[in-house]
């Protein structure tokens, strides 16, 4: 580790590589480690417990050198954060292919993974950490916002005004929760064990206020609910303790969820009954004992959430495998409340809708402002998109390179890609735009406790789909393509793929963008057609998605 090293992406239109494709990969890799973006940049950790951008600093430097030397007809191969080869390919091939954290299934356990990681043979890539397209907490914000909006529509007449949400976790992902709640006019109480993380969300305006006691927190929550005021309150504490205490006191939140780093019982979740400092010491001294405490705390955490559900609260799992750990530890009712995808998001997935994100390689916020306006002109009828973009412009603070996210579906993403490429070509924006997405998408994940939970045909654990997604994106000319294991829910529980593509204003990019931004969301439609979802079948027929065994 280099203790004082600071990495920031270059800005402007001057290249340090041989082409914009390589430059985009370089800048987004560096952006992942920007101190304003990454949770622990000195240890190369971007977000999500131990999700890293490169295996170590030596590997990081070698990746940077490789990208700077890479020709337009070559492809760099990265194996779990380490550059291992450069091969001649062709101009339309990806400039980088990445595989992170992949293990043969029988060996896909945290214990085996950590042993291999300690030996310097692998790293945990999470989703967008090791695939170089993390844009800070905004990256998950709209998904969280849309989930809560769906809850408001289904249960509370379309608004969260006068309703409050109990949740936990203010890390890189969970940090989106307080702002997503207040953007839906609700009140949030978010429990966080790490004061530093809570302060970071205050600094970036995702969180309104922070307190140290449950009494202070509930006074603020009760006042805001009574007055119909949107407010987010951070409470320094341990979720397993606070959730149970609130239930014992007879407090009944309207909504309950959680986004602690429960996917990793050792490096992520902090057990109850000890301070953060004590937990960190135990983690180093006796990892096995730590995991026992952590797992026991997760069981209590889930028991409290089940109790809230039994008492009438709207309770859902936010995809961190908290239920999975509790179930494995012997708590039979762990899955008594649903995951957020089957409960609220799957209808969007059936349309090929998912998190479409883009970043201005220039570093100029004005470029994002121009793309915002152009996108709103492109989709004048999409009121949800207009509402989101306007809210994001007002409320979201950029981290690192200016970026935006919005959820677009099959057909829409290709139109947006063509639009952005034209903006670059016409000089409306000052440098190329990089387009990517989370691995949490409609057709790029196999994750039975999250994205593919409770599939209609029972295909939750089928792992072919993310591999097909990665392969079609690679042959269609994505700028870099990644295949990962264990993101979101932890080692052994998921396979997922990512893609990033550069709009550099060229005619060649027009063709690549059209191909990739059609097939990528198209895989989401196909995957849900195959599972028997009527909504997906209707989309496929209406938009002429060619599926050999579907009667058109």
Curated annotation (Swiss-Prot):
Protein name: Urocanate hydratase
Taxonomic lineage from the root: Bacteria, Bacillati, Chloroflexota, Chloroflexia, Herpetosiphonales
HAMAP family referenced in this protein's UniProt entry, alphabetically: HutU
Active site (record annotation): 406
UniProt organism field: Herpetosiphon aurantiacus (strain ATCC 23779 / DSM 785 / 114-95)
GO molecular function: urocanate hydratase activity
Gene Ontology CC: cytoplasm
EC number(s) on file: 4.2.1.49
PANTHER family: UROCANATE HYDRATASE
Cofactor(s), by name: NAD(+)
Subcellular location: Cytoplasm
């Amino acid at each position: 580790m280099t203790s004082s090293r600071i990495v920031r992406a270059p800005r402007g239109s001057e290249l340090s590589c041989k082409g914009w494709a390589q430059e985009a990969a370089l800048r987004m890799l560096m952006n992942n480690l920007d101190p304003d973006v990454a949770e622990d940049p000195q240890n190369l950790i971007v977000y999500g417990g131990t999700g890293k951008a490169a295996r170590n600093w030596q590997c990081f430097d070698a990746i940077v050198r490789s990208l700077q030397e890479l020709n337009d007809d070559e492809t760099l191969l990265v194996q779990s954060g380490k550059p291992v080869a450069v091969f001649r390919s062709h101009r339309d091939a990806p400039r980088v292919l990445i595989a992170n954290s992949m293990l043969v299934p029988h060996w896909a356990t945290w214990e085996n993974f950590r042993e291999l990681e300690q030996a310097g043979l692998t790293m945990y890539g999470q989703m967008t950490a090791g695939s170089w397209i993390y844009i800070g907490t905004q990256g998950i914000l709209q998904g969280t916002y849309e989930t809560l909006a769906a809850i408001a529509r289904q249960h509370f007449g379309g608004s969260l005004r006068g309703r409050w949400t109990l949740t936990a976790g203010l890390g890189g992902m969970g940090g989106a929760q307080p702002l997503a709640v207040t953007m839906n006019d609700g009140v949030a109480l978010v429990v966080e064990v790490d004061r530093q993380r809570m302060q970071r969300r205050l600094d970036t305006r995702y969180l309104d206020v922070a307190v140290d006691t449950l009494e202070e927190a509930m006074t603020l929550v009760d006042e805001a609910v009574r007055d119909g005021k949107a407010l987010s309150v951070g409470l320094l504490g341990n979720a397993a303790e606070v959730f149970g205490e609130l239930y014992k006191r007879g407090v009944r939140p309207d909504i309950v969820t959680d986004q602690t780093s429960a996917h990793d019982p050792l490096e992520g979740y902090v057990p109850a009954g000890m301070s953060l400092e004590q937990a960190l010491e135990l983690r180093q001294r006796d990892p096995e004992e730590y995991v026992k405490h952590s797992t026991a705390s997760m069981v209590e955490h889930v028991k409290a959430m089940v109790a809230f559900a039994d008492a009438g609260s709207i309770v859902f799992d936010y995809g961190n495998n908290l239920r999975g750990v509790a179930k494995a530890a012997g708590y039979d009712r762990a899955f008594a409340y649903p995951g957020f995808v089957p409960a609220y998001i799957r209808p969007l997935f059936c349309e090929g809708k998912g998190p479409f994100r883009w970043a201005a390689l220039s570093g100029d916020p004005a470029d994002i402002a121009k793309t915002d306006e152009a996108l709103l002109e492109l989709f004048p009828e999409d009121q949800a998109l207009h509402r989101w973009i306007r809210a994001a412009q007002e409320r979201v603070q950029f981290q690192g390179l200016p970026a935006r996210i919005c959820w677009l579906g099959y057909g829409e993403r290709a139109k947006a890609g063509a639009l952005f490429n034209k903006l670059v070509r016409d000089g409306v924006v000052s440098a190329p735009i990089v387009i990517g997405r989370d691995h949490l998408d409609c057709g790029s994940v196999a994750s039975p406790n999250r994205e593919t939970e409770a599939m209609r045909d029972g295909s939750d654990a089928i792992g072919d789909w993310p591999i097909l997604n990665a392969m079609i994106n690679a042959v269609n000319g994505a700028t870099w393509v990644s295949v990962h294991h264990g993101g979101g829910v932890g080692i052994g529980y998921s396979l997922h793929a990512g893609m990033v593509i550069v709009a550099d204003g060229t005619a060649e990019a027009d063709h690549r963008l059209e191909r990739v931004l059609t097939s990528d969301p198209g895989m989401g439609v196909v995957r849900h057609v195959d599972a028997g979802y009527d909504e997906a079948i209707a989309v496929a027929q209406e938009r002429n998605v060619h599926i050999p065994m579907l009667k058109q």
